[in-house]
């Protein structure tokens, strides 16, 4: 009774407090996986745009006094809840690296962990959940030219990573519930690269140092999307900000790329030559490369009871290097005004400059 009386006498003051809390909460977010490559760039852009940022991850990847870190297991709701309580938006970009080839780990983190994220968001009163998905959820190793979000999920995903990203994306989009003020969206980037990239550039340079970048698969004309990391982050933030204004965006996936498809081998060559390595000069017909990779995969299956081999030359890697796969951003442009912030030329230049420690001496 006393509470009711006090609430009645201070109604204006309490309402004002709620408004202040709502305004401050709207600019407070948590980045799950914020210690990773994409996550760190996301934290930086969010801070620049005036957000208060929490990071949840299995380890603290950097120091920043403006960021509150929460360390824990993504699948443990007790670990996760403190990082999500009191925030309006959650950006979920945590995932094992695609090349890890650990099916159980992918399933646990990408699917089970994401279900835990959804449940915890609801418990904590989070209003928006933006997932980092992947354009590969629709790719099956055959050409995709200017693919839209209407393409069906891959019936035969190219790897365990993609298989679990499909499960993850479906779970997040199905969780969209405007009636309960919980809105979700998925961002599908493709070929993320940029400063501090732990995968594409280091792996490419390592292959070049070992003499494995002398050949290109196919005629070198197949167009592919590579996306600068800052453009990927920009797409996430735009989606979140427009999701609060237009609930009709909820429950949808959006392709986010540089909107400049580039021949696969041209892109790799620009990185290589920018760091003083030779670009591939010789062509292997696509059909021949695929056939050889297929035979190798059969050999690996035959000897697998005796010896475990992880071949790097696989049919799906041949397909990734030799097919067209680029995607339309028209949906993101139309619904939340996405435009790449950084052009491909500038993105490649900045990326090469950031990896000066990998440069080959002339």
Curated annotation (Swiss-Prot):
Homodimer. It is an enzyme of class 1 (oxidoreductase). The keyword Oxidoreductase applies. It is found in: Endoplasmic reticulum membrane; Lipid droplet. NAD(+) binds at residue 165. Keywords: Acetylation, Cholesterol biosynthesis, Cholesterol metabolism, Disease variant, Endoplasmic reticulum, Lipid biosynthesis, Lipid droplet, Lipid metabolism, Membrane, NAD, Oxidoreductase, Steroid biosynthesis, Steroid metabolism, Sterol biosynthesis, Sterol metabolism, Transmembrane, Transmembrane helix. The gene is Nsdhl. This is Sterol-4-alpha-carboxylate 3-dehydrogenase, decarboxylating. Belongs to the 3-beta-HSD family. One of its GO terms (biological process) is smoothened signaling pathway. The chain crosses the membrane at residues 287-307. Pathway: Steroid biosynthesis; zymosterol biosynthesis; zymosterol from lanosterol: step 4/6. A motif (Prevents secretion from ER) lies at residues 359-362. Pfam families: 3Beta_HSD. It is linked to Defects in Nsdhl are the cause of male-lethal mutations bare patches (Bpa) and striated (Str) phenotypes. Heterozygous Bpa females are dwarfed and demonstrate abnormal deposits of calcium in tail vertebrae. They also develop a hyperkeratotic skin eruption shortly after birth that resolves, leaving 'bare patches' arranged in a horizontal, striped pattern. The Str females are indistinguishable from normal littermates until postnatal day 12-14 when they develop striations in their coat. Its main location: endoplasmic reticulum. GO terms for cellular component: endoplasmic reticulum; endoplasmic reticulum membrane; lipid droplet. It is a single-pass membrane protein. GO terms for molecular function: 3-beta-hydroxysteroid dehydrogenase (NAD+)/C4-decarboxylase activity. Its EC number is 1.1.1.170.
């Amino acid at each position: 009774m006393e509470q009711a009386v006090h609430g009645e006498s201070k109604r204006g003051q309490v309402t004002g407090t709620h408004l202040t809390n709502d305004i401050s909460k709207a600019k407070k977010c948590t980045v799950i996986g914020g210690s990773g490559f994409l996550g760190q760039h996301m934290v930086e852009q969010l801070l620049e745009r005036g957000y208060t940022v929490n990071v949840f991850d299995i380890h603290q990847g950097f120091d920043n006094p403006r960021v509150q870190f929460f360390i824990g297991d993504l699948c443990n709701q007790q670990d996760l809840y403190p990082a999500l309580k009191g925030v309006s938006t959650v950006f979920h970009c945590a995932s094992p690296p695609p090349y890890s080839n650990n099916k159980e780990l992918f399933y646990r983190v990408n699917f089970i962990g994401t279900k835990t994220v959804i449940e915890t968001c609801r418990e904590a009163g989070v209003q928006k959940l933006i997932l980092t998905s992947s354009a590969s959820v629709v790719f099956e190793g055959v050409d995709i030219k200017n693919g839209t979000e209407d393409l069906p999920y891959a019936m035969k995903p190219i790897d365990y990573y993609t298989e679990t990203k499909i499960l993850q994306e479906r779970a997040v989009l199905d969780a969209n519930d405007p009636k309960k003020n919980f809105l979700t969206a998925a961002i599908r980037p493709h070929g993320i690269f940029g400063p501090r990239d732990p995968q594409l550039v280091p792996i490419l340079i390592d292959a070049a140092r070992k003499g494995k970048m002398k050949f290109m698969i196919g005629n070198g004309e197949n167009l592919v999307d590579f996306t600068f990391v800052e453009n990927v982050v920009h797409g996430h933030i735009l989606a979140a900000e427009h999701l609060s204004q237009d609930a009709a965006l909820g429950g949808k996936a959006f392709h986010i790329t540089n909107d400049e498809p580039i021949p696969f081998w041209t892109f790799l060559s620009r990185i290589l030559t920018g760091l003083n390595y030779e670009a591939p000069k010789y062509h292997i017909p696509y059909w021949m490369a695929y056939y050889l990779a297929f035979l190798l995969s059969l050999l690996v299956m035959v000897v697998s009871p005796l010896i475990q081999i992880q071949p790097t030359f696989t049919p799906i890697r041949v397909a990734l290097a030799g097919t067209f796969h680029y995607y339309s951003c028209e949906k993101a442009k139309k619904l939340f005004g996405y435009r790449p912030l950084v052009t491909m030329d500038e993105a490649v230049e900045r990326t090469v400059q950031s990896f000066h420690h990998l440069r080959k001496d002339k």
